[in-house]
From Swiss-Prot:
The keyword ATP-binding does not apply. GO terms for molecular function: proton-transporting ATP synthase activity, rotational mechanism. NCBIfam families: ATP_synt_6_or_A, PRK05815.2-4. The gene is atpB. Keywords: ATP synthesis, Cell inner membrane, Cell membrane, CF(0), Hydrogen ion transport, Ion transport, Membrane, Transmembrane, Transmembrane helix, Transport. It comes from Beijerinckia indica subsp. indica (strain ATCC 9039 / DSM 1715 / NCIMB 8712). Pfam families: ATP-synt_A (PF00119). PROSITE patterns: ATPASE_A. This is ATP synthase subunit a. It is found in: Cell inner membrane. InterPro entries: ATP_synth_F0_asu, ATP_synth_F0_asu_AS, ATP_synth_F0_asu_bact/mt, F0_ATP_A_sf. Key component of the proton channel; it plays a direct role in the translocation of protons across the membrane.
C-alpha cells in the first residue's frame, strides 16, 4: 500500500516573499498576496474595459457581465442609500468586484486567497469606515455625530445610548472584516481537507479506491457551494458598505 501523502490545509494561506524588500528597517517585500491583488485588479479592469468598449443591442458575454454587474450594484446602492448615495457608486462597485474576484480566484488551484488574510479584510473594512467618517464630517460637520445620539431617547438614557452607539460603530470594521475572513478561511480549509481525503483514498489503492467516488462527489458539491459563498460574502460585504455609507449621506435617518 502506498504511503499516505501528508497534506497541510493551512499551508495555502502562507504568505511567501517573491521580491524581498526593506525600507527603513521595515519589511515591505512583494509577496504572493500582493501579486494576486494586482492580478485581481488587472482582471477586473480587463473584463470591464472589454465589456464596455463596443456596445451592441445584442450584448456579448463580457458586455452582459459588465451591464449586469453595473445594474446590480447600482440598484443595491440606491435601495440602501438613496439617490444621493449614487456618488459612491465607483467606490462600492470597486469593493464588490475586488472581493468577489478575490474569492473566486482563491478557488483556483495553486492561487492565493487574499480575502483569507485578516490584514486584507480589515484593511478593506477600515477604508469603508474611514470613507464614511471623512465624508460625513466634511458634508455635515458636527451634525454627523448625531448618528451616536438617536432621536426620541430620554435624556436620562441618552449617555448610555451614546456609549452603545459608539461601541457599535467601532465594532463595525471588526465584524465586517472577520465575517469575510472567517468564511473564506473555513471554506478553503474544509475543501482542502476533503480533497486530501479523496487523494489519500485514491493513492491507497485496493478497496479504498472503490469508495473514493463518494467523497469525490462531496468535494464537487462543496466546491459549487463555495462558489455560491464567494458571491454571497462579496454581496454581504457590499450591502453592509452601502448601509454604513447611508449614515454619511443621511446621518439623521
Amino acid at each position: 500500500m502506498a504511503e499516505p501523502h501528508e497534506i497541510d490545509p493551512i499551508h495555502q494561506f502562507h504568505i511567501d516573499r517573491i521580491i524581498p524588500l526593506h525600507f527603513l528597517g521595515t519589511d515591505v517585500s512583494f509577496t504572493n498576496a500582493a501579486f494576486f491583488m494586482l492580478v485581481i485588479v488587472a482582471l477586473a479592469s480587463l473584463v470591464l474595459l472589454a465589456g464596455t468598449r463596443n456596445h451592441s443591442l445584442v450584448p456579448g458575454r463580457l458586455q452582459s457581465i459588465a451591464e449586469v454587474s453595473y445594474e446590480f450594484i447600482a440598484s443595491t446602492l440606491q435601495l440602501s442609500s438613496g439617490r444621493d448615495g449614487m456618488r459612491f457608486f465607483p467606490f462600492v462597485f470597486s469593493i464588490f468586484m475586488f472581493v468577489f474576484l478575490a474569492n473566486l480566484i482563491g478557488l483556483v488551484p495553486y492561487t492565493f486567497t487574499v480575502t483569507s488574510q485578516i490584514a486584507v479584510t480589515f484593511g478593506l473594512a477600515m477604508i469603508v469606515i474611514g470613507t464614511v467618517v471623512i465624508y460625513g464630517l466634511i458634508k455635515h460637520g458636527t451634525h454627523f455625530l448625531g448618528i451616536f445620539a438617536p432621536s426620541g431617547v430620554s435624556p436620562l438614557l441618552l449617555p448610555f445610548m451614546i456609549m452603545i452607539e459608539v461601541i457599535s460603530f467601532i465594532s463595525r470594521p471588526i465584524s465586517l472584516s472577520i465575517r469575510l475572513f472567517a468564511n473564506m478561511l473555513a471554506g478553503h480549509i474544509t475543501l482542502k481537507v476533503m480533497g486530501g481525503f479523496v487523494a489519500g483514498l485514491l493513492g491507497a489503492g485496493s478497496v479504498y479506491a472503490l469508495v473514493a467516488p463518494l467523497p469525490l462527489a462531496m468535494v464537487v458539491i462543496f466546491t459549487a457551494f463555495e462558489l455560491l459563498v464567494a458571491f454571497l460574502q462579496a454581496y454581504v460585504f457590499t450591502i453592509l458598505t452601502c448601509v454604513y455609507l447611508n449614515d454619511a449621506v443621511h446621518p439623521g435617518h
